Amino acid sequence: MKLVLQRVKEASVSIDGKIAGAINQGLLLLVGVGPDDNAEDLAYAVRKIVNMRIFSDADGKMNQSIQDIKGSILSVSQFTLYADTKKGNRPAFTGAAKPDLARQLYDSFNEQLAEFVPVERGVFGADMQVSLINDGPVTIILDTKCH
């Protein structure tokens, strides 16, 4: 899995002008699923995300997790994280998981996250508009195959 984590003051995702999910303080996750991803990748990503200390404590140090601040997650599927830009000027997305597998793993990932923190989400495969107010900004890339 490839994920982009953005610390936000608020974020929302809309489809056809209607809000599908919205959060206040927390994390916006852009979630890409690869063809070789499995339950181990999901568990690793969930563990890292819910425990990563990227929120400020009383002294202004990044020392608190999303659980510590009682934040929420907005999860948005994003197959374009697997873009291959090596040849030409048009990205290829053949490195992303096929839709059936990606949807299954994305849904399972969100269910596992929801065991720890509230999770809002976009609609898998939909054309979405994402709005956010970055906090920091703090943006972190997490690749489950690089640990």
UniProtKB/Swiss-Prot annotation:
Biological processes, Gene Ontology terms: D-amino acid catabolic process
Entry-linked Pfam families: Tyr_Deacylase
One Gene Ontology CC term in the entry: cytoplasm
Highest taxon of the lineage: Bacteria
Catalytic activity of the protein: glycyl-tRNA(Ala) + H2O = tRNA(Ala) + glycine + H(+); a D-aminoacyl-tRNA + H2O = a tRNA + a D-alpha-amino acid + H(+)
Molecular-function GO terms, alphabetical: D-tyrosyl-tRNA(Tyr) deacylase activity; Gly-tRNA(Ala) deacylase activity; Ser(Gly)-tRNA(Ala) hydrolase activity; tRNA binding
Primary localisation category: cytoplasm
Protein name per its UniProtKB record: D-aminoacyl-tRNA deacylase
Species the sequence originates in: Streptococcus pyogenes serotype M49 (strain NZ131)
